[in-house]
Every structure is written in C-alpha cells, then in structure tokens.
C-alpha cells in the first residue's frame, strides 16, 4: 500500500551552484547547451572544501514549496461569481428581433442589412 508522505522539495548542491552562477559574466551570451556544459566544468573544478560548503548551504536552503491546488468546488463557485451574464444591449435586442427578415441573405450581408436598418431607425428617432 502506498502512503502519501509530505516531503520538503529540497535542492541539491549542484542546483544551488547553478542558481548562484546565473549572473556569472563568463556564462553570459552562451547558448543554453554550452552554458550547461560550462557550468558543469566549473562545478567539477571546485575544490572539496568549496563543494562541502556548497552542500552545507544546499541542506540549509529552504525547499521550494508546492502550490496548493484549490478544490474544484471553490473554482466552480469563483467562476460562477465572476461570469454573471450581461444584459443585452438595445442593438443586440434589435438584431435578434429583425435578423429573421433577411433569412435568405448570406450571414455577412444579413448583418449589414440589419445594421443599415438600425441606422435608419436611429436617424428617425433622433438618437445618435
């Protein structure tokens, strides 16, 4: 039987070394593959005292924390709250009411005809 054991996501000495070498001017401008090879050479060239100090710092380094996932119920509730349906505008209501008049036209022409009808109506009523 497998058991879930919470574990600290610790980092190793080499990972800490790579993090520290991020701003090394010798590595700037190199391709990623070349940068990895160069970092590896630099790490292998460290003396044992430096490696031991690096391992000690890596052991003391706080581990990366996993992000807690939100339960699905909370996500669904949040999505329901934020996505309230908007009331349709006057134009949308007009289009819905009059789109059937131009049933035989292709969709693009149908929308142009409804828009033209909307503009005519707006001119008649005196609205901008």
Curated annotation (Swiss-Prot):
InterPro entries with a match to the protein in the record: HMG_box_dom, HMG_box_dom_sf, Kinetoplast-DNA-binding
Biased composition (Basic and acidic residues): 65-76
Domain of life assignment: Eukaryota
Keywords, ordered alphabetically: DNA-binding, Kinetoplast, Mitochondrion
First-listed, main subcellular location of the protein, grouped into a coarse class: mitochondrion
UniProt region (Disordered), positions on chain: 60-87
Similarity field: Belongs to the KAP family.
Subunit field text: Associates with the kinetoplast DNA network.
Annotated protein name in UniProt: Kinetoplast-associated protein 4
GN (gene name): KAP4
